[in-house]
Amino acid sequence: MNIGQRYGWEFALAALLIIEILLFGIANPRMLDINILLLSTSDFICIGIVALPLTMVIVSGGIDISFGSTIGLCAISLGVMNQTGIPMAAAIPLTLLVGAICGIINAALILYTGINPLVITLGTLYLFGGSALLLSGISGATGYEGIGGFPPALTDFANLTLFGLPMPLMLFLLCVLICWLFMHRTHSGRNIFLIGQSSKVARYAAIPVARTLYLLYSLTGIASAIAAIVLVSYFGSARSDLGASFLMPAITAVVLGGANIYGGSGSIIGTALAILLIGYLQQGLQMAGVPSQVSSALAGALLIIAVVGRSISLHHHQIRDWIQRWRNQRLSS
């Protein structure tokens, strides 16, 4: 298989991304400013940080829709720890631990109950979200009021640049590299595809299914914690609703990036390109004066188109055979 066949979908996404930027640039020349393009990634790049390990979860045949609440819980946990005087050098690793525990809870419930991951993570979505609100109330911040008072070392992070790139974008690129190397260049990563194709066969082949799922859901929790830390730095406060709007664009990016929603196939590079495609779509529409409700509707339509288009591309041989049989029947009649 040559590189064009292997990465054809990724090349198509890259071409669509360039076309999208050029079209929005015609409507608003500011969209072609490289500085605006780079700085605007901070508005949506945290979705990509979570979508990368979510890709691996979906490839394994699972799903996690609780990451939005995990982000809120991790953000509030960081705020409470800051309020109690715990230094950031300790609070940040503890926040990552909170995210990992959330992922472990998801994996444990899925493995030991045998219930569909969608149902389990729907339950933990409310569990983690309620816990975030409870912690927020204990800290004295009622409802969705934020917890502030973070040190400048944290709040300045999201505004820093490295080699001309915003730090959140650099962090995202680092996550892309790590996830790509793990998923496509390690034995454990290749096991993810086998588990997604058939977990029963994977168990018969002595693949550590349970250990792999614990790892994947933990990585999603840790990524949610990283996103929470970046969001707290970006907004300067911790709120329980910071990840509330991440669910639809993250899943859309994973599916648009080439992942089979039923498991067995997917691409980290595809997800990364899809995040940029969706993010710049929303940015371009906002700069064009399109209401946010319309951009949300377009994101939903994009998810449907991605699922249908990917399904057609995966089953084009069967579709072609069906069309040929239908034509033969018409001719014979």
Curated annotation (Swiss-Prot):
The complex is composed of two ATP-binding proteins (LsrA), two transmembrane proteins (LsrC and LsrD) and a solute-binding protein (LsrB). Pfam families: BPD_transp_2 (PF02653). This is Autoinducer 2 import system permease protein LsrD. Part of the ABC transporter complex LsrABCD involved in autoinducer 2 (AI-2) import. Probably responsible for the translocation of the substrate across the membrane. InterPro entries: ABC_transp_permease. Keywords: Cell inner membrane, Cell membrane, Membrane, Transmembrane, Transmembrane helix, Transport. The keyword ATP-binding does not apply. The keyword Membrane applies. It is found in: Cell inner membrane. It is a multi-pass membrane protein. Belongs to the binding-protein-dependent transport system permease family. AraH/RbsC subfamily. CDD domains: TM_PBP1_transp_AraH_like (cd06579). The gene is lsrD. GO terms for molecular function: transmembrane transporter activity. PANTHER family: ABC TRANSPORTER PERMEASE PROTEIN YPHD-RELATED-RELATED (PTHR32196), AUTOINDUCER 2 IMPORT SYSTEM PERMEASE PROTEIN LSRD (PTHR32196:SF71). It comes from the Bacteria. GO terms for cellular component: plasma membrane. The chain crosses the membrane at residues 7-27, 45-65, 70-90, 91-111, 118-138, 162-182, 212-232, 240-260, 261-281, 288-308.
